[in-house]
Structure formats: C-alpha cells, structure tokens
Amino acid sequence: MLTLARQQQRQNIRWLLCLSVLMLLALLLSLCAGEQWILPGDWFSPRGELFVWQIRLPRTLAVLLVGAALAISGAVMQALFENPLAEPGLLGVSNGAGVGLIAAVLLGQGQLPNWALGLCAIAGALIITLILLRFARRHLSTSRLLLAGVALGIICSALMTWAIYFSTSVDLRQLMYWMMGGFGGVDWRQSWLMVALIPVLLWICCQSRPMNMLALGEISARQLGLPLWFWRNVLVAATGWMVGVSVALAGAIGFIGLVIPHILRLCGLTDHRVLLPGCALAGASALLLADIVARLALAAAELPIGVVTATLGAPVFIWLLLKAGR
C-alpha cells in the first residue's frame, strides 16, 4: 500500500513538472510569435522592447492568468455541483458580465474608458453571483442551484441579444466579437485586472481538502464534518469573481473550464491537491497555444480565441473519451 502511494505521488510530481515545462515553453513561444517573429536574443533590442515588453508580455500574462482561472473554475464547479458538465458559463456568471458591459456601453453612449467597462463587467458577474448565493441560502440542493444558474444564464443571454439587435451603436455591434473572446486589446492598462485574479487563484489552489470532500458528494461531505453551506457560498463567490475578471479581460471563452479538468482526470489526476495546480498549468498552456493560433492563422486579422479553443479542443476531448472507454 505504501509503495503504491509513493508511486502515485511520484507520478503526480512528474505530471506537474511536465505541465510546468509545457506552460513555460508556451509562454516563450507566445512572446516570440507574431507578424514579426522576435527570438529571445533580440528581446532587449529597440524592436524587442516595443513588441515583446510593451505589447506581447501583458497579453501573454493575461492569457496565462485567464486560462488558469477558467480551468480552476471548471474543476471547482464540477466538484461543487457533482456534475461533469459544470463549467464557468453554466452558472450564468459569464453572461452576467456581458450584460454589465453592454449596459455600460448603452448608458455611457460609448464614452466610458476601458477600466470603467471592466468594472461594469465585474459588477454584472458579481450581481449574478449574489443572486446565486441568495438561492444557496435557501438550502437548495446542488442540482436545483445548478438549474437556477442555467436559467439566469438564459435570461442574461436573451437580454444581450435584445440589446444588440435593437441598437444602432457601432460599439455595441463590436461587442459581439468581444463576447467570442479575444486578447487583442489587452495592454499594461489592464494590469489591475490581472492582479485581481492572483490572490483568488492562489487561495483556491490551497483548498484541496474541502474540494476532495465535496467531490465525494453532499452526504459524504456532511458526514465528514464539512460545513457545506459555508463552502458552497465561498466557492460560488470566488468562482464568480474569477469569471467576472476573466470576462472583463478577454470576453467569454468556452471549452477551457469544461475540458481541461476532464482531460486531467482521464490522465489519472483525481486528487485536488494535484488537480487544482494541474488545471492552472494546463489551462494556462492551452489558452496560450490557442492565442498563438488566433494570432497567426490570418495574416491581416485575428481570430476570436473562443472559436480556436472549441475547434482545437473538442476533437482532442472526444478522442480521450473514446480512448478511456476501451
């Protein structure tokens, strides 16, 4: 038994090391890639100072943090709701952030600065989160709370569609592209949003013990002495914050929160002590690679990163499912 435990521990360490190396390679490639490829030897040249340090570095850091946040949010939701289909967009938080952003564009008549739009997106996400917490205080089961999140997401999606199709604002039309996800407008002015993600990410990665209990189910977690109501509220609030900040940075990005935790579980990473940091590393790596493809696929334009993540990730996920089912 002790030998098996040690073997599993070594395997987990190997996985984390491999994911760390993959993320580092993706980060370096992201800094080099673009219309003008700049190798590390030229990073401190005048051209490198502009393209690498002022343009690509803030974008790369934003992609890294958003990928980690979405993947961890997916792992948390799947444990919290005991549902393999749970992911950041399912609770309606992403759509709530979109409603906040569209309301800001309408009320501000397109004159609000980017930081104000970001705050409105976060506010929209947190409002949906507060509504979910209100439902949670009524001691609803996780399945009913999940359905409440789906209903809120549908309502928010309908509000966004009404606002977009009945508006003549050019800025509002452009939000349709933004809601498909993209990091094209990220620079150092959004660094406060990146900083806002870091403490919540680190805190959730340290909560492996309650997450392992939640993964056993409500009844087992309660029997083990876990204050279920408290942890449900805290995790929903933390997830709402991470998703709200992510949407404010890059728009709505699917697939990462749904598939990355699944892939790691299929690879044998089921303990949240390893799964949570693994999701952060794998989510960051996957979104960095998708962002590189979005930048390089077209010569004079940039693809929405949400389209890239779905196109590249769905076939991989189907292949893994078929392989696991043999």
UniProtKB/Swiss-Prot annotation:
Residues spanning the membrane: 11-35, 57-81, 93-107, 114-138, 142-166, 191-206, 229-249, 258-267, 275-296, 305-324
Intervals, Cytoplasmic compartment: 1-10, 82-92, 139-141, 207-228, 268-274, 325-326
Compartment(s) where it occurs, according to its Swiss-Prot or TrEMBL record: Cell inner membrane
Family stated for the protein in its record: Belongs to the binding-protein-dependent transport system permease family. FecCD subfamily.
Full protein name: Vitamin B12 import system permease protein BtuC
Chain's role: Part of the ABC transporter complex BtuCDF involved in vitamin B12 import. Involved in the translocation of the substrate across the membrane.
NCBIfam families: PRK03784.1 (NF003001)
GO cellular component, as recorded: plasma membrane
Membrane topology, as annotated: Multi-pass membrane protein
Periplasmic side: 36-56, 108-113, 167-190, 250-257, 297-304
One GO BP: cobalamin transport
